[in-house]
Amino acid sequence: MANRNGGFIGTDGLDAPDPVTGVAASGGGASISVSFTAPTDAGTSAITGFVAQASTDGTNYSAGSGTGTSSPITISSLTNGTAYTAKVWAINAYGTSAPSGASSSATPVAPRAVIAIGQANDGSGNKEEIDYFDISTTGNAADFGNLSVLRVAMGSGGGSSTRGMWAGGSGASDVIDYVTIASTGNATDFGNLLSATQGCSSLSNDTRFITGGGSSSPADRIQYVTIASTGNAQNFGDLTKNKAEFYSTANSTRGLWFTKGSGNSNEIEYVTIASTGDGTDFGDMTVECESAAALASSTRAIHGGGSGNKVDIGYVTIASTGNATDFGDLTVGRTRMGGTSSSTRGVFCGGTASPGGVIDYITIASTGDATDFGDMTYTTQYTSPTSAAHGGVQ
């Protein structure tokens, strides 16, 4: 039975909750996400909320704070590049629990986007280069390095707050490769897909990288790897139908694939990332098309563009299945472009239109038209972006 007051607030320690357990932290852009397990014994009164506090020295937990009613809690306004640990307190009407044990350290990072730049629009062919830029600061992309194998048609990339990853690609590749997002340089082999395929599309939270579809049989297969451990993919389940040359995105719990890439459609389907199984219908996009870009925050998933050089941007609330709602328009209509994000800003990179090297951005929480961000190093299509602070790692 709960029998303590942690001293944070409250008057009756006998009725305060037991301590929170299982505290873990992961870094985002100027923030950390703190996950935890609520106590079984809530005390005499139900738990009304939780407080997460950050520390840079493991002693003074006053470097930042966040509140919430469930796990995870985000602690914002932290310093990129500084390591933090976190503790969590549970609160009810009578008081506050003793502090949890400290999490392992997590380091916020600038929301860097890394983009496999794809196929040049000027006829010079496929490119192995990777571009990068800081999502929080408008401007042009710079060279990051090269893929481990020259290929395009990889759909969306994925990864964690530290690793960017790509899978499959032209020539029916089975390659999975990765980069360390904070350090420019060439990609390294991670492992192999279950079979070689191009036109697949990937998504991730901070622990699992999931790839779906592709032009090679079985074209409805979903497969996954654990991001922290190099190795080959395992079977996850099946998409609702065969799909290729499409795009995808995720938050920390759900992954979404948009349209089907072969013949116009408006389908959205989803999986629960932590649980292997088949895809489920989510709803419909605002337009029918092929190859619409996708990106997400922790709450919203966004689609943009598509075949016929669509300008349309639409959004859904990830936690609630249903049809997309109009968000706004791109600065120029295009298709075969990728999207990625920080916790607040989404970017669309490249595409088939002229100029094909354009980067647009939106503020994910606020509907409206996209704004010019800058340019990629090439004018390309089939771009495949990911970032250190996309929806799945917040």
Predicted regions mapped to residue ranges:
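Beta-strand-rich modules
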Residues: I75-S97
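Conserved aromatic beta-strand anchor motif in extracellular beta-sandwich/beta-rich domains
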Residues: G49-T56
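Short loop/turn segments that connect beta-strands within beta-propeller blades
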Residues: D134-T138, T180-T184, T226-T230, T272-T276, ...
